[in-house]
Amino acid sequence: SCNTATCVTHRLAGLLSRSGGMVKSNFVPTDVGSEAF
C-alpha cells in the first residue's frame, strides 16, 4: 500500500523491531543489562 522509500523503510523497521525486538534485547542489553556483563 505504500510506495515511497520512506514509508517502506518505516514498515521494514517496524517489522524488524516487532519480530526481532525480543531477541535483540537479549543480545544487546540496555544500560542496566550491560552492567551485568
UniProtKB/Swiss-Prot annotation:
Question: Which PANTHER family is this protein grouped with?
Answer: CALCITONIN GENE-RELATED PEPTIDE 2 (PTHR10505:SF3), CALCITONIN-RELATED (PTHR10505)
- Where does this polypeptide localize? Secreted
Q: Coiled-coil stretches, from where to where? A: none
Q: Which cysteines are joined by disulfide bonds?
A: C2-C7
Protein name stated in the entry: Calcitonin gene-related peptide 1
Q: Which organism is it from?
A: Sus scrofa
Matching entries from InterPro entries are given as: Calcitonin-like, Calcitonin/adrenomedullin, Calcitonin_CS, Calcitonin_gene-rel_peptide, Calcitonin_peptide-like
According to its UniProt entry, what is the function of this protein? CGRP1/CALCA is a peptide hormone that induces vasodilation mediated by the CALCRL-RAMP1 receptor complex. Dilates a variety of vessels including the coronary, cerebral and systemic vasculature. Its abundance in the CNS also points toward a neurotransmitter or neuromodulator role. It also elevates platelet cAMP. CGRP1 can also bind and activate CALCR-RAMP1 (AMYR1) receptor complex.
